[in-house]
Amino acid sequence: MAEAGQPRPLTAFAPPPPLWKHFTPDNLKRLEEVKKEASKGEDGKPRKKKWTPAELRALQLPPELRFLVPPEIPMSGQYSVFGELQSLSTTLPSLQEQGIEQLYPSTPTETDPNKPSQPSRPFNHAYYLLKISKSLLLNFLEFVGILSITPEQFQSKVEDLRNLFINAHHLLNLYRPHQARESLIMMMEEQLNRSREEIQQMDKMHAEINGFLEQLKAQGIDVDSASKSGENDTAKRTTGDQDANNANSSRLVWDILDGTD
């Protein structure tokens, strides 16, 4: 058995932390029972509640169940990736802080962070990235020449190549905020253009609907006038029929009276 102080071997895929052994069905069931018990109201019935990690950490849990609760998010410190320590800080350290020679000029803020920034020419990342790329090609050709003539003197040229790659990678990381801003500007412009197209389509649809309503309105006026004229004709025809009927009735009455005489 390996000793506790013995470092773990580096592997392509790191092993899971030991606490995974506590994620058993029984422990998960017990945690749900504790959550139901803690969520009971005054009537003694459990209520549906969405637990936050902070609320779960505040519960009185046994040690084997505490591993099932998400821990607090670390805000500082370091973590290990394949045996290399990485910092949680999002601030990009300078090459000088890492003890690496910087092959491109520093910006005013990198030279003196406490000095108030003044308007200056923007740093051209692409220009220096291109120069470093050309230097990489030249140094690689020199490296191949050294290997073909004096292979034992390769170490210095390997260091030069390593330094060039690190500088190029650092320049790319410095360029990421600018790239993020440009990507955000492009995304907002696309949203603005899409909103303008939607507004134009809505205006077009509004005009079509107004034209259709005007057409219906005009057709409705014609129908109303036609129906009114039809009603007048019907009324006149009905009045004439009634007059004829009245006349016939009167004539019959006079005929009857004449017959009785």
Curated annotation (Swiss-Prot):
Localization of this protein: Nucleus
Transmembrane segments: none
Entry keywords, A to Z: Activator, Nucleus, Transcription, Transcription regulation
One GO location term (cellular component): mediator complex
Chief location of this protein within or outside the cell: nucleus
Positions of the UniProt region annotated as Disordered: 1-55, 224-250
InterPro entries: Med7/Med21-like (IPR037212), Mediatior_Med7 (IPR009244), Mediatior_Med7_sf (IPR044888)
Gene Ontology molecular function, alphabetical: transcription coregulator activity
UniProt GO BP: regulation of transcription by RNA polymerase II
Polar residues compositional bias, start-end: 241-250
Residue spans of biased composition, Basic and acidic residues class: 23-45, 230-240
Family (UniProt): Belongs to the Mediator complex subunit 7 family.
Quaternary structure note: Component of the Mediator complex.
Role of this protein: Component of the Mediator complex, a coactivator involved in the regulated transcription of nearly all RNA polymerase II-dependent genes. Mediator functions as a bridge to convey information from gene-specific regulatory proteins to the basal RNA polymerase II transcription machinery. Mediator is recruited to promoters by direct interactions with regulatory proteins and serves as a scaffold for the assembly of a functional preinitiation complex with RNA polymerase II and the general transcription factors.
Name of the protein this chain belongs to: Mediator of RNA polymerase II transcription subunit 7
